[in-house]
């Protein structure tokens, strides 16, 4: 399943709020059967917080973010060195 990066604003002085947002993101994803919250990354210097969701579409990831009250700035498809790659020949996942 593709991963999506949800970009949000989180002030440097509010860094402690990230854990609360993580829990809201996790709960919102659990309400949507095809979405999974993976983790978040806070960049205090830039006052940005990124939430990673696995979802079948950008729309589903954005819906989870909105339900969590994350107020997304943008939602983009993301690739990671941890993202499984599917071998089309036999359908097995490889890293």
Identify the residue ranges that each predicted region occupies.
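Short S/T/G/P-rich N-terminal loop/turn motif that feeds into the first structured element of a domain
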Residues: 1-31, 43, 81-95
């Amino acid at each position: 399943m593709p991963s999506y990066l949800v970009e949000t604003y989180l002030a440097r002085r509010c860094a402690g709020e990230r854990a609360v947002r993580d829990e809201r993101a996790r709960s919102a994803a659990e309400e949507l059967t095809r979405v999974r919250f993976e983790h978040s990354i806070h960049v205090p210097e830039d006052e940005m917080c990124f939430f990673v969701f696995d979802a079948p579409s950008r729309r589903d990831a954005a819906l989870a973010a909105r339900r969590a009250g994350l107020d997304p700035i943008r939602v983009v498809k993301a690739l990671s060195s941890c993202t499984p790659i599917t071998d089309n020949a036999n359908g097995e996942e490889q890293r």
